[in-house]
Amino acid sequence: MQAILEHLYQGGRISREQSQQLFGAIIQGQLAPEQLAAALISMKVRGEYSEEIAGAASALLADASPFPRPDYTFADIVGTGGDGSNSINISTASAIVAAGCGARVAKHGNRSVSSCSGSSDLLAAFGIRLDMPAALSRQALDELGICFLFAPQYHSGFSHAMPVRQLLKTCTLFNVLGPLINPARPPLALIGVYSPELVLPIAETLRVLGYQRAAVVHGGDMDEVALHAPTHVAELREGTIENYTLNAADFGLSAQPAEALRGGSPEENRDILARLLQGKGEHAHESAVAANVALLLKLFGQENLRDNTHRALEEIHSGAPYARVMALAARG
């Protein structure tokens, strides 16, 4: 282990197997905080490679508590966080809306580390039980088309890294890992990343991890599909990665200012999203969610982004997404 750490300190890259060994030790609490901090910063400064990310993800998935994986097609939609935008929880709202459009979503999330409100902070504010047993979460996925999997419930090893992550107050490989270690192991994923430099490496990592189809996005300094700036996309399909750019017009939408998506505390975000999911939200909010839902639906084989956007907006305006949230909360 010391040889791996020393190699990292010298700015070297490590193999997938070495990364799996390193992160296996991390989640077993075998590294001192100083060693962990130094390793994470060493990788951050020179940039993380896809083999290293895949090795780390494999270590955490191997250690995860089991989830009864369905045999039907389902997805995750999740962002790394750490983009500094403090926006409303677009991916969480998108997951709920997408479920009403026929896309089953098992969303993996956590409490906030570096922003105002993570997905789990928001869900707790809605009264949704974060420690729902795996069998009940699977039942919700079957019957409601959506479930939320709280990372610490399935990845106890995260606790060993959390104090160091909070102390560093910056994005590290752990921010990148969160979207890749969904214990349900979805075959499809829409993943937002906090830096454009991560778009292709994460897509390559998804290919190594065996995803059927996925899209990795970064738009205008946000880990989402953006409407205020071009969105950079790396789409994985049948082992091939295609890079392209999307603009608001591709969704049949008008551009919206980034400031319009500013969020706040979990309670404030809950109120914003409650209005949105009841069909009473702000135009910029529903447009942002609809665009992200549209790209997610594309991964399910619904290729027309404009049609998908229209469908998502109809679902939002119906108010049905809010009823879905309340139904999930009632399963407490």
From Swiss-Prot:
Its EC number is 2.4.2.18. Pfam families: Glycos_trans_3N, Glycos_transf_3. Binds 2 magnesium ions per monomer. The keyword Magnesium applies. InterPro entries: Anthranilate_Pribosyl_Tfrase, Glycosyl_Trfase_fam3, Glycosyl_Trfase_fam3_N_dom, Glycosyl_Trfase_fam3_N_dom_sf, Nuc_phospho_transferase. The keyword Signal does not apply. 5-phospho-alpha-D-ribose 1-diphosphate binds at residues 79, 82-83, 87, 89-92, 107-115, 119. SUPFAM superfamilies: Nucleoside phosphorylase/phosphoribosyltransferase catalytic domain, Nucleoside phosphorylase/phosphoribosyltransferase N-terminal domain. Anthranilate 2 binds at R165. Mg(2+) 1 binds at S91, E224. It catalyses: N-(5-phospho-beta-D-ribosyl)anthranilate + diphosphate = 5-phospho-alpha-D-ribose 1-diphosphate + anthranilate. GO terms for cellular component: cytosol. Pathway: Amino-acid biosynthesis; L-tryptophan biosynthesis; L-tryptophan from chorismate: step 2/5. One of its GO terms (molecular function) is magnesium ion binding. It comes from the Bacteria. PANTHER family: ANTHRANILATE PHOSPHORIBOSYLTRANSFERASE. Catalyzes the transfer of the phosphoribosyl group of 5-phosphorylribose-1-pyrophosphate (PRPP) to anthranilate to yield N-(5'-phosphoribosyl)-anthranilate (PRA). Homodimer. Belongs to the anthranilate phosphoribosyltransferase family. This is Anthranilate phosphoribosyltransferase.
